[in-house]
Amino acid sequence: SVRPGSFKIRFRDQATGRLRYQYPYRLLQREPQSAQRKGFGAQDVILNLVPDRFANGNPDNDRIAGYADHVDRSDDGGARHGGDIAGIRAHLDYIQRMGYTMIWPTPMLENNMPRYSYHGYAATDLYRIDPRFGSNEDYRQLVQAARQRGIGMIQDVVLNHIGSHHWWMQDMPSPDWLGFQGKFVATRHARTTLSDRYAAAADRENFSYGWFTDTMPDLNQRNPVLATYQIQNTIWWIEYAGLSGLRVDTYSYSDPAFLARWSSSILREYPHFSMVGEEWSTQPLVVARWLRGYRN
């Protein structure tokens, strides 16, 4: 019932009602016919690219104050190489000539990690494009420019974990925000535990809530506030940027009940949208669990 526009969100002391903090917020207008957007399908040719390794269109963002991981092209391993949104946009005509109809970049959200930040899979802010790639508006304009050439954009989403330098880590919203109460317990990657009715509960717990690495804290989506946050975050990016689809990293590693809620929430907003999830297993019975319409 809230109309688009700017307003202040006020936070008050629950006991006294005293105003503690207020945050200026802007609610954007939805695009016309947004809910009817079409996703990608078998007819599409998808280009998967790593933005940092693709093309450097704006050398001015190679070094950003406050970001430890800078461009070093002499390091062909984990260092950043300077590719950015401007570089992708400058090559849209080339991508179009190659016959691609969808672009799937690896994650471009802020990844302010000390090292190996180029890949993007350890986000430190879920609402901000990494400034070494460009701005949120740069990203939105890239999507629009691609659409004008008949090319859609698939966003790479990470629901399972964040980076260990995410600002949440300085002051957790709640003690159960992370798997294993914020203590590093490595997942054993036992993906079959979810489909094995005889699997030990401890093994299932470890798979869904164990950390991917010690620099990628696992998110505990059994926390209802976190679950709602992630759902709203995904819908916001679809609407704000004008996305054509989602590719979800480490899909099966998140809480299974949350994944069902997340997927149904997205499809409720966008019935014709397309989403695919990463599942490493080669066993059909394990992969089948995640197919649309599968009863589990």
Residue ranges with predicted function:
Residues 1-152:
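N-terminal structural segment of carbohydrate-active enzymes
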Residues 46, 176, 248:
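Active-site regions of oxyanion-processing enzymes, predominantly non-cytosolic
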Residues 104, 154, 274-276:
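Structural detector of well-ordered beta-strand residues that form the stable sheet scaffold
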Residues 169, 174-241, 251:
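Active-site-adjacent "subsite" loops/lids of carbohydrate-active enzymes
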